[in-house]
Amino acid sequence: MIDFKSIIGKVATGATLTRDEATAAFDAMMSGEATPSQMGALLMGLRVRGETVDEIAGAVSAMRAKMLTVTAPPDAVDVVGTGGDGSGSVNVSTCAAFIVAGCGAPVAKHGNRALSSRSGAADVLAALGVKIDITPDQVGRCIAEAGIGFMFAPTHHPAMKNVGPTRVELATRTIFNMLGPLSNPAGVKRQMVGVFSRQWVQPLAQVLKNLGSEAVWVVHGSDGLDEITISGPTFVAALKDGEITTFEITPEDAGLPRAPAESLKGGDAEANAAALKGVLQGKPSPYRDVALLNAGATLIVAGRAGDLKEAVALGAQSIDSGAAAARLAKLIAVSNTAE
């Protein structure tokens, strides 16, 4: 058993933890072996100093070791945002997930209810009629039969109940805001991850590389969006063939028009569900464009397209042929017929 006090003492001096120390510390927290004050001290110490790649990788390893896993094809992909960007935008990655699935790439989407916005992935999917509180085996069946499955974080990460109250009391962003998107229960090795701050774009790509991911885009919009934005440039760190490159992309790179960030403002779960349905029905809008851009990046990560223009054209075909909407209909049907 780890000496948690010595870990806090180390962080208090400004020293960094090794990956193994971080794994042990977060294992203790999620096992209920650390007291609330010890957890709060460590989380705030890391936040104030700034978490390192090794510390995040160690924490993710601890979280992955405790999660309830889902069986998915080896080429499955996730498209997910950290949330916490304060934008109150429509559900971009959720909409993108159906577009990607409509292109034939298996999607193992991981998400939760809203933390800071009015509608998280789980909220909007539930409003659409998807059953979200299903077992890991049932999620696997959704991926196999519908080409897409949704893994509701609390179901797959039961050990998080031990840190939940401390997180609520701290009421500020901690390392845990980054761990969820990096701890996909289907063990996907291809990820499109949006983050709430530019400072984390390159480090999180490095974390995923260190943890064995094969193809990754980590993105942050210049307007603060934890997705690829259509209001301006987006900062990207891409992992491909073991190498990480950083670059910027714009909507024009994909042949899409710009639109102000305000055009992506969302509402509650019902309003966002209606907007998502509108996109899948083929209605032109800035929401369609931003969903296509994020789906396009995910298709590149999935190995289905070589560049953004090609990827966005594939995504548009997925919508306009009805394939994306068919994936949603199938997910609703399969998730509600639990065996």
UniProtKB/Swiss-Prot annotation:
One BP term from GO: L-tryptophan biosynthetic process
GO terms for molecular function, please?
anthranilate phosphoribosyltransferase activity; magnesium ion binding
Residues holding anthranilate 1: G81, N112
**The keyword Transferase is assigned to this record:** yes
| UniProt: anthranilate 2 binding residues | R167
The cofactor binding remark recorded in the entry reads: Binds 2 magnesium ions per monomer.
Q: In which pathway does it act?
A: Amino-acid biosynthesis; L-tryptophan biosynthesis; L-tryptophan from chorismate: step 2/5
| Chain residues that bind Mg(2+) 2 | D226, E227
Ligand binding (5-phospho-alpha-D-ribose 1-diphosphate): 81, 84-85, 89, 91-94, 109-117, 121
This entry's Enzyme Commission designation comes to 2.4.2.18
Residues given in the record as Mg(2+) 1 binding sites: S93, E227
Task: Identify the cofactor(s).
Answer: Mg(2+)
Recorded GO CC terms = cytosol
EC class name: transferase
The record's section on SUPFAM superfamilies has: Nucleoside phosphorylase/phosphoribosyltransferase catalytic domain (SSF52418), Nucleoside phosphorylase/phosphoribosyltransferase N-terminal domain (SSF47648)
Which UniProt keywords are present, listed alphabetically?
Amino-acid biosynthesis, Aromatic amino acid biosynthesis, Glycosyltransferase, Magnesium, Metal-binding, Transferase, Tryptophan biosynthesis
* Catalytic activity reported: N-(5-phospho-beta-D-ribosyl)anthranilate + diphosphate = 5-phospho-alpha-D-ribose 1-diphosphate + anthranilate
Per the similarity annotation, which family is this? Belongs to the anthranilate phosphoribosyltransferase family.
Q: Function, please?
A: Catalyzes the transfer of the phosphoribosyl group of 5-phosphorylribose-1-pyrophosphate (PRPP) to anthranilate to yield N-(5'-phosphoribosyl)-anthranilate (PRA).
> Oligomeric state and partners?
Homodimer.
Q: What protein name applies here?
A: Anthranilate phosphoribosyltransferase
Which organism is this protein's natural source?
Rhodopseudomonas palustris (strain BisA53)
